[in-house]
UniProtKB/Swiss-Prot annotation:
Residues 93-121 are annotated as: Disordered. GO terms for molecular function: rRNA binding; structural constituent of ribosome; tRNA binding. HAMAP family: Ribosomal_uS13. Keywords: Ribonucleoprotein, Ribosomal protein, RNA-binding, rRNA-binding, tRNA-binding. Belongs to the universal ribosomal protein uS13 family. The lineage of its organism: Bacteria, Pseudomonadati, Pseudomonadota, Betaproteobacteria, Burkholderiales. Part of the 30S ribosomal subunit. Forms a loose heterodimer with protein S19. Forms two bridges to the 50S subunit in the 70S ribosome. Located at the top of the head of the 30S subunit, it contacts several helices of the 16S rRNA. In the 70S ribosome it contacts the 23S rRNA (bridge B1a) and protein L5 of the 50S subunit (bridge B1b), connecting the 2 subunits; these bridges are implicated in subunit movement. Contacts the tRNAs in the A and P-sites. One of its GO terms (biological process) is translation. InterPro entries: Rbsml_uS13_C, Ribosomal_uS13, Ribosomal_uS13-like_H2TH, Ribosomal_uS13_bac-type, Ribosomal_uS13_CS. This is Small ribosomal subunit protein uS13. It comes from Variovorax paradoxus (strain S110). One of its GO terms (cellular component) is cytosol.
Length: 121
């Protein structure tokens, strides 16, 4: 089993798909990495040589991935919240921040519905 950037890459998958197991690498970037390292992206991970894996590791080292990327994203959101801008306010309240409607929908961001409170007298 190939281990790249601290992640076990599934051996039975093609190189292009297997690399997407790493946080921060999607299909497009995986294809770019394969092309830059001279590896056919339809080749399975288990068929790659150690030299091929080393070339892939060198290419991946050029990008921000995994823990560093998660930390950077978290810090960007925290910065928005600290400066008190609109997007930071929406993050703090757990609402959509890109102009979507919230009267209906927005359930993914707001979470499950709260039960309606009954009025007792």
């Amino acid at each position: 089993m190939a281990r790249i950037a601290g992640i076990n890459i599934p051996p039975h998958k093609h190189a292009e798909i297997g690399l997407t197991a790493i946080f921060g690498i999607g299909r497009t970037r995986a294809r770019q990495i394969c092309e830059a390292s001279g590896i056919e992206y339809s080749k399975k991970i288990k068929d790659l040589t150690d030299a091929d894996l080393e070339k892939i590791r060198d290419q991946i080292a050029l990008f921000t991935i995994e823990g560093d990327l998660r930390r950077e994203t978290t810090m960007n959101i925290k910065r928005l919240m600290d400066i008190g801008c609109y997007r930071g306010f929406r993050h703090r309240r757990g609402l959509p921040m890109r102009g979507q409607r919230t009267r209906t929908n927005a359930r993914t961001r707001k979470g499950p519905r709260k039960a309606a409170q009954s009025l007792k007298k």
